[in-house]
Regions:
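N-terminal glycine-rich FAD/FM-binding segment characteristic of electron-transfer flavoproteins
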Residues: 1-180
Length: 180
């Protein structure tokens, strides 16, 4: 199992999107996440990468990922990855993350993503936020978002100036939005 010791977070660069495929076809959630990932990558000035695992994935689908913003696509082609298995996909994805070190990893809130995401987070000793409705790394853009979606007095609230990912999701049955 992968393990981090005294992690140097400065070594982590880039935004990644796990691109789901079924029967060789990349799923629509992948394109949606790439579009969001592109915004984050632009704000951070880093590369956006798509990660596809499977076997015999249609090459046209892989090429299309660039049209949705991916600067690079990692395609792990192995017959053992043709159909999703929790342990197989988690091992391959975690190994790739340990090797390449992206700072942000986006995984869709699908059945597959809800299985894979927590397992990878646990193996990599990192956090996970599910069901996000807004993502931001730019504090000014985040303040603008809050002005239009909340009652927070943004101008009189102190915000730490950093590029940490701010993840907004529903809380308390959807009656409140929480940013993590």
């Amino acid at each position: 199992m992968a393990e981090f010791n005294a992690m140097d977070t400065a070594a982590f660069k880039g935004v990644w999107v796990f691109c789901e495929q079924r029967e060789g076809q990349v799923q629509a959630i992948s394109y949606q996440l790439l579009s969001e990932g592109r915004k984050l990558a632009n704000d951070l000035g880093v590369e956006l990468c798509g990660v596809v695992m499977g076997s015999e994935v249609n090459e046209d689908y892989l090429k299309a990922l660039g049209g949705y913003g991916a600067d690079r696509v990692y395609y792990i082609d192995n017959p053992l990855l043709k159909d999703y298995t929790t342990d197989g996909y988690a091992k391959v994805l975690c190994d790739l993350i340990m090797e390449k070190k992206p700072e942000i990893m986006l995984i869709g809130a699908t059945n597959l993503g809800r299985d894979l995401g927590p397992r990878c987070a646990a193996r990599l000793h990192t956090g996970l936020t599910a069901d996000c409705t807004h993502l931001d790394v730019d504090v000014a853009k985040y303040k603008d978002f809050l002005r239009t979606t909340s009652n927070i007095d943004v101008d009189n609230t102190k915000f730490e100036e950093n590029t940490n990912l701010k993840m907004t999701r529903p809380a308390f049955g959807g009656h409140l939005m929480a940013t993590i």
